[in-house]
């Protein structure tokens, strides 16, 4: 069934292709991107798709310029984590030892992070783990190691102000070389410590088209601006602002383009038509802005925004996503934005810059397109693919199938639907321990304990634990019996030893005359009596 539908779709496309020989799309400028898992609570929706100006409007173009930033769309850096790893020995007076391990989060110092970062770059940074226990009798002793860990972490860049932007930063942005995060035990350090002058950034040439009603008097409220980076910018919400010594205007989305004071429309100077921007106005980028902040009141953009939010609702409910759902999350106009894909069942995103490209149709035999203009040279627009069921998937739902390379959003726009566009796949956000709550500080007061890893707590069990095998127990029994017999023998022999030690005594009433020596002195009659 699927193959027959695919064949019919390809046949249908073959008839439609001549009518759409130059299909204009907004697509990532690089053929490969650096993908990261989408974390929970992410609901970024880009600015709506490009508007088509009314046929009755007169269009004129003028050469302008826009800052592209002194840094790329993302900046390399490192997260520095600090914790105290503690081994506690509770040595009781009656014998047992209680050994516990715990981890305590602490705020790293600048010197600790610099030292650890130098070791990390040289490949000598190691985690010592828990220290060995140090036990003192009848006391509680702590042994601790200060463990500093370094992990690479890329952040976005606000091209205009030179600020780093990331959900981990407090408030979502940072302009220092040592940035606090929502986790008190972690700080972010940029890989390049050099401070850049904002006005030292490059300004790229840009052709801006201005549309107006030629039947009415030219005023700011009746002007619409358009460029390859700006889809539909209303003059009514545009103001005049000097930036780095250049005259220019700031669009409603916060982006700035130069506008020469000599530029005219129907012999009327364009720059004075706009009012001055309020004092303290900053030039901003909308890359990290929330979808609700860039949503305008025009009905053409409400649909895109609703479809995008509906897709995030599916992600939140952990429902499977189709390639068409992914296309709703992507930017529809040139400029900085985010691209989405599915990698091993995980919804992933990447920072990118969308550029205008022209393709032969919504279904291609090869992933090739023309840049700069419809008359340009065709080149590969994408080379990075991931497994997606029986097919492969690229950015924003772009499918690599047996029937060709399909762009779901553009196929639906032409009323072409097939089963492959609705192929479902698990695409859940990653449960990362660092959830992006940029407006609050994460609670790092919790301490991690690994429980009692010491010896027995019972003195009786402690004694019986001395004998770990039956041989030792038998030997102990024999020794005990011998000791008892020895003690009994000593007690029995003690009276005998005491008797032999006594001295002889003379009997009372025995005269010494009975001795042999005295008999010779006795008379005979006395001897006879004796």
From Swiss-Prot:
Result of altering residue 30 to S: In strain: Isolate CIN0360R and Isolate CIN0360V
TM region(s), chain numbering: 474-494
Residue ranges annotated as Virion surface topological domain: 22-473
Presence of keyword Membrane: yes
Outcome, altering residue 128 to P: In strain: Isolate CIN0309R, Isolate CIN0318R, Isolate CIN0327M, Isolate CIN0327R, Isolate CIN0331M, Isolate CIN0360R, Isolate CIN0360V and Isolate CIN6514V
Signal peptide: 1-21
Family: Belongs to the vesiculovirus glycoprotein family.
GO cellular component, one term: membrane
Site annotation Interaction with host Vim: residues: 149, 155, 159
One Pfam family hit: Rhabdo_glycop_FD
Outcome recorded upon mutating residue 219 to T: In strain: Isolate CIN6514V
Region (Fusion peptide): 58-177
The name this protein goes by in its record: Glycoprotein
PTM summary: Glycosylated by host. Palmitoylated by host.
